[in-house]
Amino acid sequence: MTKPKDTYTSEQIQVLEGLEAIRKRPGMYVGGTGLSALHHLVYECVDNAIDEVMAGFASTITVRIGVDGSCTVVDDGRGMPVDPMVSDNPAIDGRPAIEVIMTQLHAGGKFDDNAYKVSGGLHGVGVKCVNALSKWTDVEVTKETKTWMISFSRGEVDKPLHIVEEHKGKKRRTGTRVTFLPDPEIF
């Protein structure tokens, strides 16, 4: 172990970008890197699905654990927003809302009563932890007549938001499917 410097100056101050802080210090966000932290990732996705049920927009939640260790949480709620953000911040303006939700700390719809009266999880942080601490994350959203998908690798956009299916004029079920593989570099 190296001895700390006798002086404490601006040279020791770090500014971490994006989800880097979560990957660097997962214990601050999910309580560590052990089994309970791994479970915390699942709970965050389930909490989001429960929020849709509690708000009266969903009735079914499905959780699947894959043979590869991945986890999928599906709800039949409204589906995460996929429309472009409108913001004075040029780093956010025009980006798909789902991308911002998955990658920007403290971005979400649970800070006031406009989208949810009751909600669980780490508001504006939870699903970002899942994304940051996973080797890969796929999010699929069905809204109106389309199914959209966005993919991430260790918290970074891997495949931008795109339409994976058009439902030929007929309205389909709505909802969100989050599938992630916890990162073996972390857990």
PLM feature spans:
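Short beta-strand/loop element within the Bergerat-fold HATPase_c
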Residues: 60-67
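Bergerat-fold GHKL ATPase/HATPase_c domain
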Residues: 1-46, 50, 100
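Conserved helix-loop functional segments at active or binding sites
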Residues: 21-24, 28, 51, 55, ...
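Secondary-structure capping and boundary motifs in well-ordered enzyme cores
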Residues: 34-38, 65, 122
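Generic, well-ordered alpha-helical scaffold segments in large soluble proteins
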Residues: 25, 44-45, 49-52, 76, ...
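GHKL-type ATPase core
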Residues: 2-12, 69-97, 108-187
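Sterically constrained small-residue positions within well-ordered secondary structures
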Residues: 54, 64, 169-171
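Conserved ATP-binding N-box helix of the HATPase_c
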Residues: 35-60, 126-133
